[in-house]
Amino acid sequence: MTKGILGRKVGMTQIFTKDGVLVPVTVVEATPNVVMQVKTVESDGYEAVQLGYQDKREVLSNKPEKGHADKAKTSPKRFIREIRGVELKDYEVGSEVTVDTFKEGDVVNVTGTSRGHGYQGNIKRWGQSRGPETHGSRYHRIPGSMGSIINRVPKGKRLPGHMGMKKVTIENLVIEKVVADKNVLMIKGNVPGAKNSLIVVKTASKAVKADK
């Protein structure tokens, strides 16, 4: 069954394995999540557990948010997400989910929001090659031809625009270390997002054997 937790990306560091191998890891702080709601087929049409992470100031919360949090006997949360495919009997509204839900060697998927780069051109956004800089060329960093026949821009044409700030999931990452007393997960490799961005860590649905 699926397990999941919400957390915050702290940054990257390096640790040594038991075999003395230096491994780059991302440090994820996941203080205890509160189970805000348990959704069932009878009441909602599907099964899921709704988790809440990081307290939100009440002055910034509206009445529906406060009422929803009151049912779980907790304060309003800043980051709320659902985890599907879980064993519902293991969760109760108001209970907590901690990092020791996972163990070292677990394979997980991590979902976050990619870093924003603002408005960028084709070369940075799509990796397009530039044109010649000299010998009379007038094609340097522009997008290129839009087509010679149709009188419109084709759908999906790679053009300049806003880069980043999109939902990204990286699959089959390995948990190298669990530090339960500090509410920290150390995940091998990098995860989406900037420092202090909010992420979702859950069991990989297409897990492959961990490469140790």
UniProtKB/Swiss-Prot annotation:
UniProt protein name: Large ribosomal subunit protein uL3
Cysteine pairings via disulfide bonds: none
Protein's GO biological process: translation
Listed GO CC annotations: cytosolic large ribosomal subunit
Molecular functions per Gene Ontology: rRNA binding; structural constituent of ribosome
Entry keyword Oxidoreductase: no
Function: One of the primary rRNA binding proteins, it binds directly near the 3'-end of the 23S rRNA, where it nucleates assembly of the 50S subunit.
Oligomeric and partner information: Part of the 50S ribosomal subunit. Forms a cluster with proteins L14 and L19.
Species for this entry: Lactobacillus helveticus (strain DPC 4571)
Residue segments, region Disordered: 119-146
Keyword annotations from UniProtKB, A to Z: Ribonucleoprotein, Ribosomal protein, RNA-binding, rRNA-binding
Family, similarity comment: Belongs to the universal ribosomal protein uL3 family.
